[in-house]
Regions:
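Charged, terminal alpha-helix-loop-beta segments
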Residues: 1-241
């Protein structure tokens, strides 16, 4: 059994100090202010689904047509998955203008968080921030879409991009995407595309900051867990014990 040394304690404390300093700097430079946070949408999956769907929707109030939708579909792992399914994006933005984006769309086997209908395809985005998987959830969505005559393409969205439970997915082919990388980077790309439209740009930037905050909160929880695990590990015991 290995003893906890003074250096181990110093390293642990240094990690905590670095994180605390980073959080204080975040507050002081104004990034802690977030209208989405003030509206208490942080942890509500339905609210995030509506926000994401609004940006994806070619007919939404942002007035950008299918620009944001195309940018999302062109994300590397998203594009790889839809191409593998046979989904082809035609040249030019206009080809996606007819896409229909919905939230909480009712199917016989439940409600899908986000759906994108386009030319016989139905892209389903199952949004999981904190809620647990339901039994056979992805399998049921896949079957429900097939029953409509459309071809399903499934995405499983979480903060960190982890896999769905086997009880939910079974052998259904789906693609993992994350808020931390896929959504955050996509939102940043959308903000860059509307530099001349400050009201839309700042809304996107605010949402991007919220995603970073949620991702950082998850990192804090993971770090706390690692610290507790490290301090209670059987590999260490207090000096002199």
């Amino acid at each position: 059994m290995q003893e906890i040394t003074t250096n181990d304690i110093k390293e642990l404390l240094a990690r905590i100090v670095r994180w605390t300093n980073a959080m204080e700097a975040h507050k002081q430079d104004g990034h802690a202010f977030n209208v989405f946070h003030l509206c208490s949408v942080d942890h509500y999956e339905n609210a995030h689904s509506r926000i994401i769907a609004e940006f994806l929707n070619p007919r939404a109030s942002h007035g950008m047509g299918s620009v944001f939708l195309r940018d999302f579909l062109m994300r590397p792992n998203v594009l790889e998955h839809i191409k593998r399914k046979g989904f082809q994006i035609e040249d030019g933005l206009g080809s996606l203008d007819s896409a229909i984006v919905e939230t909480e769309e009712p199917f016989h086997e439940g409600r899908c968080d986000i759906t994108i209908h386009w030319r016989g395809w139905c892209i389903v985005i199952e949004n999981k921030i904190y809620a647990a998987d339901q039994p056979e959830q992805l399998m049921r969505y896949n079957q429900a879409v097939e029953k409509t005559g459309e071809r399903p393409i499934l995405f499983y969205l979480t903060l960190d991009g982890h896999s769905a439970s086997t009880e939910s997915s079974g052998d259904v082919d789906y693609c993992r995407i994350s808020y931390r990388e896929d959504i955050a980077e996509w939102i940043a790309e959308c903000a860059n595309a509307v530099q001349e439209l400050p009201h839309i740009r700042e809304t996107l930037n605010q949402y991007h900051n919220l995603i970073e905050e949620l991702s950082n909160n998850q990192k804090v929880l993971k770090m706390n867990s690692e610290i507790v695990k490290e301090m209670t590990s059987s590999h260490y015991h207090p000096i002199g014990a």
